[in-house]
Structure formats: C-alpha cells, structure tokens
Amino acid sequence: MLRWFLSHLLGVWLLLSQLPREIPATDDKKLKACGRDYVRLQIEVCGSIWWGRKAGQLRERRQISEPLAEVVPSSIINDPEILSLMLQSIPGMPQELRIATRSGKEKLLRELHFVLEDSNLNLEEMKKTFLNTQFEAEDKSLSKLDKHPRKKRDNYIKMSDKCCNVGCTRRELASRC
C-alpha cells in the first residue's frame, strides 16, 4: 500500500514539475511606435491572444450550426400601433393593406398576416427600422464625435505622441484599452 502511494505521489510530482514555467513579462520594456505601427501595437495589446481564440471559437460555432429562422411574435402582429409601423417600413407593401390596418378590416389583416409570414423580412431589420424612426428626432443633433469627451481624445493623442517620441510600455498601452 505504501509503495502504491509513493509511486502515485512520484507521478504527481513529475507531472507538476513539467508544467510550463511563467514567461518573463515584457510589459516593462519600452517600445517606440509611430503612426501605423502604434495602431498595430495598440490593437495587438488590446486584442490579445485571448480575443483571437474566442473569435475562432465563435466562427466554428457559426459554421457548425445552421441559421435559425426568425419568427415575428404574435404580440407584435396583434398590436395595431406596431403593425402600422411595420407597414410603413416595408417597401412595396400594397396601399390597401396599409389602409386596412387603420380601418380594422379583418379579412385584409389576415392577408397581411400571411404576407408578413411569407416575406423575407428579418426581425432584426424590423427592430432597427423601428428604432431609427423612433429616435429620428434625437438623431438630428450634432455629430456623435462632438458628444465624445474631448479630454479622452486628448489623452489618446498624448499617448501616441509619447510612444512615438519617448517610448511606452505594453502595460501603459493596456491601460488605454
């Protein structure tokens, strides 16, 4: 029994001694990078090997699984407000069907239901269309860049200048991710 225990203990010790050692960190090494090289270095640091591995796994899953059919929930089709918004967003929809939703004609609404089932509309496209029409008034404001804090943009520019002129470490670049 003791011999069996010692042989297993020796086996575990040998396995643990073969684990890869920690590679010395290169985070403190100064790197000089300007322009495209700086952008590539920033992408390399922020999108490390872990991200690449995750993206590869997602690609494999997409290739294996078949595309799922999207179904419009019946609660959307039964709601007259949403239905009228859907009709406005569908190009080439007959005017009769648009009027039918407003007047409440059941026969034409049933036809509409079949048209919507047969159409190649994607639920995500319909959601985007609704969100675009819903927030159309809000989008007429100034560009999105003006809303982005200027201080953060200035820090990014200062960091690129520092990496170009003086040099920066991977740790400093990682803090900007």
UniProtKB/Swiss-Prot annotation:
UniProt GO cellular component terms: extracellular region
- The domain of life for this entry's organism is Eukaryota
Function, in words:
Relaxin is an ovarian hormone that acts with estrogen to produce dilatation of the birth canal in many mammals.
Complexes and interactors: Heterodimer of a B chain and an A chain linked by two disulfide bonds.
Cellular compartments annotated: Secreted
Please give the tissue specificity annotation from the record for this chain: Placenta; syncytiotrophoblast.
- Assigned keywords, A-Z: Cleavage on pair of basic residues, Disulfide bond, Hormone, Secreted, Signal
Q: Which family does it belong to?
A: Belongs to the insulin family.
Propeptide found at 63-149
Signal peptide positions on this chain: 1-25
List the cysteine pairs that form cystine: 34-164, 46-177, 163-168
Organism encoding this protein: Canis lupus familiaris (Dog)
Q: Does the keyword Ubl conjugation apply?
A: no
Instruction: Write the gene name.
Output: RLN
By what name is this protein known?
Answer: Prorelaxin
Q: What InterPro entries does its record include?
A: Insulin-like, Insulin-like_sf, Insulin_CS, Relaxin, Repro_Hormone_Insulin-like
